[in-house]
Structures are given as C-alpha cells and as structure tokens.
Amino acid sequence: DGLCDAHSCFARLVLSWWAEQMRLWVDGVLVNEGDLFDTACRWPLPERCRQGAALDLVLELCSPLHDDGALISSHLDLEPQPGDLDPEGTLLPAALELHLAADGDLPPRWAALDPSGVEAQAAVATHLHQAAQPAGSLNWLGHAHLDLAWLWPVADTWQAAERTFRSALALMRRWPELRFAHSTPALYAWMEQHRPALFAEIKAASRAGRWEPVNGPWVETDCVLVSTASLWKQFAFGQDDSRRRFPEWSHELAWLPDSFGFAAGLPAVAAATGVRWFCTHKLAWNAENPFPHRVFRWRGRGRSELRSLMLPPIGRRADPLEMLEEQRAWHQVTGLENALWIPGVGDHGGGPTDELLEQIALWEEQTTALPTRAGTVREFLTELEQDDQAWPVWRDELFLELHRGCATSRPDQKRHNRTLERLLREADTASALLAFTGRDSSSSSDWRPLLFQQFHDILPGTSIPEVFEQAEPVWCSARRQAHQERDRRLAKLPRPKGTAADWSWWGLQPLASWSPLVRLPAGSWSVDAAPLAQQAAAVGGTWVQLPRQHGSCSVPLRRGSGLASCAVEARHSVVITQLGSGVWRVGNGLIDFDVSAAGLLALRDRDGCEQLSSPLKLERYRDRGEFWDAWDLATDYRSHPLGVVSTDELRWLDQGPLVAHLMLRRQLGASCMRLDLRLKADTPWLELICSIDWRQTHEVLRLNLPLATPAVRIGADTSGGVIERPAEPITAREHARWEVPVISWFASQSAAPGGGMAVLLDGPQGVDWSSDRLGVSLLRGPTWPDPSADQGWHRQRLALMPFAGSWSDAGVPQAAIGFREPGFCAPQAAALRQWFPALPPQLTPVAMERHDDGCLLRLINAGAARCRWTPGAGWCVRRTTDSSVTESLVIAPGDLVALVLVQSS
C-alpha cells in the first residue's frame, strides 16, 4: 500500500554506523557514503517507494582496523511534505517525545485511551497544540571541524578543506539563513595561495557576515607539549594573519575545540596577543571528573584572564531532541536560557548538509521544538559577556583526564620540535644582535613549518605512518634553513680586526651564568692567548672548559698545534674515587654520586646530603587495553611489571678532570639499552643519556627516582609559565593527574628549610610523582594508528639536579635551559663580548627578537616572589605597554612580560 499517503508525507531511511567506510547502494546506484567521522545519514526514499515499489538496498560497511565495526541503528522517519502543515500528524510521535523531554505531560485521561487508536492520536495533537513552546532557545551556525592530519595525510586535508568550503558556499546560495564558521589561519593561507578563486568567494561571504573565521593560533595546536615561545608564536601568527585576511571581523578568539588539554599558562600567552575568549569542547571527554563549568573566567598565575566557553559537541546533526538536551544541559549548569549549537560533519571536514538544514527547517514551525535562530559565534559571545562578572573563576590548568600517553608516544616528533624551535629562537636572537650593531636584519625567521607540525595529532604522535613519513623532510628542511639563517646572521656581526680566532662559542640565551664545557677538535685551545683547561675526549677531540660568561655572549677560540694539556686548573674539577670492588664515587664539589654495574647507587648535593633513598630504578610494564592506543597510557600498567636485565658491565669512557663518563647496559625483552652517566666540571647536575634500540610493543619504559627527603610540592614548567601541584593528591581531580606532560623540567620541593630534586629534560616527557619518588616515562609501543610508532633507536637525555631552598631561587628553570641548550660552537671568528645583559636566576627568558627601538625580550617570573631586574651600566629597559625607559623594573610573580631592551647611550 506504500509507506504513507503520497500527497501528505514522505520517508527517510535513517542510518548510523561505526565503520572505516560506509556505502549505501539502491538498485545498483551508490546514493550515500560515510566513514568514521560522517557516521549517519537521513536518505530520502524516492517517489516510487512511496507508491509501493520495492527497493534493492545494499549496505557495505568496513570495520576500522582498531575496533569492531557496527550498524548502530536503522529506521524510517516519516515527514510531512515541505511546506505542509502536517494534517496527518506524521510528526506526532517525535513531537510528543520532544514535549515529554521538555518536562511536558501527557494528555488528560491518557491512561484510559488506547495509545494506538485514533482517539489517542487526536488527544495528543490537541494537547501539543495547546502546550507552550519549550523554555529556552538555541543560536545555531554550521561548522566543520577539520584535523590537519590524523587518519589521513596532510595532502588529503587540503582536498577535504576545498570540498568543505565549496559545499558551505553552495549551501549558502540555497539557504539564505545559513551562517558558517571555520578555523585555522594555515588553511586559509593555503586556500589563498592554491585556490585563489575559492578564497575570493570565502572573502565575499565573510564581508557579508555569513562566513565567520573563528581563528586563534596558526593551527589548532597542542597546548601542553609546546614551549612558551612556540605558543606565543602560534597566537601571534594566527591573530596577525586573521586581521590581515579578514579585517571586517574582530579577532579575539582562541578556537581550540579538540586539543588534548590546556596549560595553566595559556591565558597569559593568549591575552598578550589580543585574545579575550577561549573556546573548547575537549574537556567533555574527561573520564573521571566532569568539568563543572560551561562558561567561566580562566585566570592565569599572573593577572591575565580569558573568558571561556565549553562548546557544544562538534560533528553533530540537527536532531531536535539532541538540541533540546544540549539546551537543558547548558541551562542546568549556567542558568542561562540561550544555548549554542554548531552542527556539521567534522574531524575530516564536511560541514552542514542539505539533509541537516532541511531538518532544522522542518522543526522551526513545530511548537514542541526549541526556538532557534541562525547567528554567529561572536553574537552569542557578546550576549554572554553582559554578565561575565558573575561567572565562576578557574585558577588551574584545564587538564584532560584522558590521553596521558601523548607526551611519550613518538619521541622523534618531540626531538624535531625542540631542535627546530631552538634554531629559530637562535636565528631571531642573531637578528636582534644585527639590529643592535646597525647591520641589516630585515629578514625574519619562518616559524610556520614548526607551528604547523605542532598540530594536536602530529606533535603528540597520534596519526597514521604516512603523516610522519611526510613530516620528516619538512622537519629536516626547516631545521637546515633555520641553522643556515642563524649562522649567516652571526657571520655578519662585527669582530675585532686582526683576530686570530678561528672558532667561537655562542651562548645566546641571556642566562645569569654560563660555565661552557665543550668538545672541540683535537688541539691546544686558548682565549685571547690565555690557555684553557682541557682533557682529551675518549670518543675523539678535546674537552675544553671556557671562562664563565653571563648574558648573551660569544667567546673566540684559538686552536694551536699540539695535544690538549691539563696545565690549567679546572673550576670544580671532577674527582673519581674507587670505594671498593666495582664501586666508584664521582664528584665535582657541587654534586657527587656512587655508581656500580648495578647502576646509580647514591646521589648527594654539595653539602653531602643524600638525595636518593635507594638506587635509581629502570622499570618496564605492560601497557595494553586502552581504546585510544597511541593516546592513552593504560590505567593499570603498574599492575603488570616486566623484567629488566643488567649485564654487569660498567665501562669508563672519560675519567676527568673535566668530564667523568661511564656506560652501563641493560636488556629490556627484545630491546637493549645503553645508559651513560656523565658529570662535567663546574656543573650542578648529573647527566643521564639513554640510547635505546626499542623493539617492544604495548609496553612502557620508565625511570624511577626514590627520594630521600619527602616532597610536599611538585613544580614543573608548562606552556606559558610554571605550575605547582601537591606531592600527594587530595582531591579527585588531583588523583586523576597520575601522569602529566612536562616540557623541560620538574622538581620536588621539600618542607622548610626547603631543597629538593630537579629532573631536567631534553624535551617533553610524561612524568609522575609522589612524596617519595619522581618518575619519567621514556618510551611506549602503541600499534594504532601507527603500527611501528616508537620502534627503532632513540636517544634521550635527562639530568638530576639537587638544590637548596626553592626551585625558583636555585634557578632551576634557567638550569634547564643551560642543560637543554648549552650553547654551540662554530668554525668562525667572533668577539669576546657580552651582547645582551644577564637576567637574574629567578627570571626565565622566553624569546629575543629585533625591535624598532632595540631588542624585544619576552620573559617569565616563574617563582612566587617579585623580582627586580637591573640590566646594568649602559642599558635601559621598558615594557612594550609603556614608552618610558628605566634602569630597572620589577616583575610580579607569575607574570609573562614583553620588554624592550635599549642601550642607554
């Protein structure tokens, strides 16, 4: 008889699935396709079907590689013809469901009626016609979340973006009320260069107020693994580019719906680039503790603050029941009536569809559905902002209680990131030096390749192999270019005439103190004819201790003929003492340790205080069972320990007086590890070098430091500053932070009179702690989405640094810079000179760049006390927000500031 009266309604086949690929064939014709991201359809049945004709349907589903696939649901929806007032009551069942979900009631005498009878249908229709429309409303606009890479390579992203953008523009022509929002300046830049005609259409739609660029950083970046300098560049590049391309909009948004957590310092960085609003959805993924707010003021350690919005789900359709549930959830948390809805296929692009817009139009006339209106994100935020002083304040990081393995997966990406960032900062500093000396410094460093690779599925290591294979030449090319640019600029700097120096050492960071100890080609080395302390290196060349330096500086080096000599006494030279059979004590007056073939047995500070309660432990565990394999560390990994086999081999490589270097070996299942311990003269930390041939899968390798003195607090650097946490968790949220990302250091802080142990890192790592230990995750072995993610050779460095007092007064953040970036040598001449003055140990340099009036210096006061900086004779300083210069200024605790350094002459 047909599905319904052909003149009163028609039907849609409604499907939802979980599949790598979905294809729907009707009578041999492909009518719909989907995947893991486009997971539902509402296909309209053809006219002949409504007349009773049969359809030959074939549904093709392909399971994902990492999971079982499924056809989740399949049913028919009946709808009135477009423009029809639904005289047959086709929508009554769905309308009644909406009415009840909005706390409505059933018709009077419902219990006495037959639910399937005509009388019941008439009673429902009358009851719903008389009922009030649900309280509340929704602002809606189309959206298409698009990951720059993930389960597809970057080249596919450009194609997906083009399809999405063309589709959105075509829909705008058919649906005059449609507004569409999209993010990512890097995408718009590609479109402008490679699809100029399409970009011109986007610009026209933007000027008409229908295309809304919801940009923020250059890409939707990772926000817990990148340094402060990179995060600053992300926002600065993104905001500047957005203002240039779309001047008709104000650009005050940080649109980051899908990044894996947000560092406590992000408000300071974003606010400094003009951002006022932060928007995300990701905290809805919290596994243990639902995030309590939907709109709030996020306050950093300093005085910075962002208005913050927890977005509705991304990638949704226009189901009126889902929209009602979102509005009710919003109202319950915020007390506000008007909510936001951003429908559109996401992750791999797509955006809104005709089906979606038809569904919105269908329910606009129904009194049981929420009132909706098309608008923009900025209109919604402006409305919210009227009552922002009543919002709750959040004074913490926005920790994602999921994806705790991202800091450890794919360490090669983290290594590339830290190396390229260092080279870019050095190139920028060299440009500032040229500007100070009156040389040409007009060219700027290209940060865009680095910023692109910091996307939240590339840097964390959570993409398919092709993404990383294609990223490798990008990393290498960008590193080579930054290296060449840095050296080219340094070569232009003035140097004394007639200098005999043929090498030079550069320390471009303005640290309080440098004690350079470098390995140079074999020979006898001197500075300005003054011989230097030297030691022949076991692996070739000569260890040379340079004079102490301060600030940004350079040291000319002269290589003479002959062998290295120890005639010059070293500062805090290394002394090795054999304590017994196979046990040695090594020290330099600042730190000492005991070692045997069993490993690091003991560690002491300069006063002889023990730092370890037992030997350093190398631990290996099974890491299996989480759905998001590359993302998530198994919650129960400590319940599944695996073995580590010592080889009883200890081999000395260097034995002082400048460097003591020894090597141990360990067997880790099918993998092997070489652990080097190295202590340098006049250095307050012990360096550990882990060289690992990793062949394990679904395992985690960790270092564990048992502390001799209980910790009460843990400090660690984070994007935009420093965060401190209790050593023992108290609240449920603190218990959920059992593994966290750290960028370059973390430190235990003991009770009064203080002191503790700092672990200095060569790049981001996952770490954990308690009051009696510190732990570092070295390697994992996930197999999805990259089957060989962490396999192969890895070299990772870290250092153990005991300290007295607080980590801030001990200069731990600057020590981490000195460990990670110990300066560099180049076969070119230079002057013996301090180019820029030194910062106090309590201040951490972030970046140095050329400025019209001098040198732009960004820095952080990471500690808990105010710090005064007096650059010294010949220098003045001012804030970028103030035109008056001064000989000194005070930096408040937690402040991230931009200063202009000028020569007083």
Regions found by a protein language model. Give the residues of each.
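Catalytic domains of cell-wall/extracellular-matrix polysaccharide-remodeling enzymes
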Residues: 246-292, 350-359
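Alpha-helical scaffold elements lining the catalytic groove of polysaccharide deacetylases
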Residues: 223-244, 311-331, 636, 640, ...
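Aromatic-lined ligand-binding clefts that engage carbohydrates, nucleic acids, or primary amines
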Residues: 3-28, 57-59, 506-508, 518
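CE4/NodB-like, metal-dependent polysaccharide N-deacetylase domain
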Residues: 231-265, 272, 326-340
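Histidine-centered catalytic/metal-binding microenvironments
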Residues: 83-140, 144-150, 421-525, 529-532, ...
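N-terminal catalytic cores of secreted or lumenal carbohydrate-active enzymes
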Residues: 14, 24-233, 242, 425
